[in-house]
Amino acid sequence: HFSIEVDKDGFDVKRYPGIRDADFDLLPMIRQALEIKAKQGQKDLRIIASAWTAPVWMKDIQDWYVKGSAQNDFQGTGGVLKQEYAETYARYLIKYLQAYRQEGVQIWGLTPVNEPLGNNGQWESMHFTPATQNEFIKHHLGPLLREYPQQAPQLLIYDHSRDQLEQWADTIYGDMETAQFVHGAAVHWYESSFRVFEEVFDRVHQRYPEYAIIHTEGCIDDLGNDAPPGAADPQGFKESGWFQNDEFWWNKRATDWAYSVNWHGVNSADHPAYAPVHRYARNIIVSLNHWVGGWIDWNIVLDSRGGPNHVGNYCGAPIMIDVETGSVYYTPVYYVLAQLSK
């Protein structure tokens, strides 16, 4: 991800700083991928965009996030969008779409925000409830997308853990004023390291068969990290030896964010150690067999540590590269994705 900074003083949504980040310009990679795809004669490369947060001055906490600590019982937050800036934030998203279009890149899908339930203040986020996202789409983002001068992106609601999809679907799909703007829902896999929640997909599809379900993010997270503050870690487990080592990927040597936590509302029994190859294969196959129309890994390629990542949330990826030596490692999950993409 990258940041598009806008200043509150004199902010005008007619003026936009552009999408070229000096340190992390995505456009060359996207253009190269589009060129490759165009020569294949298959379906278009579809890009889904998801902002992690509004600019800080649009939020109640006036910051990117507040970390969890002993002072707040380790309950960090990303804050919420101030109601007076709902229209401004919606126009900010539209300007992003237009900026990419001016560069020759059509964004296929859009979510109102990444992970609206938050991440306990570990990095940038912004919270919505089903009700507040419903109102935001109904009165602000939806109408603006309807007015989009060319082909508008498909709007995907939610974009967080699968287990709570039903509540969001019932609230938003159940409101026809909002549902008219929506293509479907986006989900992630982080609420368990082995459960797929296919029963949730079945129930949502049974009630709302006209709406798509797309898995927009999953990865091996917290790779080689210590347990976070406020989490019990009696075994002191920490991954190691994943680069140029297929054995790591085929055996139960990976853990996720909730492997040993004792936070309220988190069942650590749903987060046992796992074999990355098996988790990927099972999750993709079961998801596609239960109405999920597409499955996207969070990363394409990372360095050998699992970064770069500005908050140290190192992750596994299909391709990992030692930037010092230039050694390229196609991990076993690369071949899982390759096989299931055929």
Show the residue positions of the predicted features.
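Aromatic/acidic polysaccharide-binding cleft in carbohydrate-active enzymes
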Residues: 215-339
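Active-site neighborhood of glycoside hydrolase catalytic domains
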Residues: 85-112, 116-226, 230-254
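Short acidic/His/Gly/Ser-rich catalytic and metal-binding motifs that mark active-site loops
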Residues: 2, 55-72, 116-122, 165-167, ...
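A structural signal for short, well-ordered beta-strand segments and their strand-loop junctions
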Residues: 47-49, 109-112, 215, 295-297
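N-terminal catalytic cores of secreted or lumenal carbohydrate-active enzymes
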Residues: 1-108, 128-131, 139-142
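A short helix->loop->beta-strand "cap" motif at the edges of active sites that frequently abuts
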Residues: 38, 42-45, 153, 208-211, ...
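Short glycine-enriched loops at secondary-structure junctions
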Residues: 51-56, 113, 161, 301
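Extracytoplasmic/secreted proteins, especially bacterial periplasmic and envelope-associated proteins
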Residues: 25-28, 32, 84, 88-95, ...
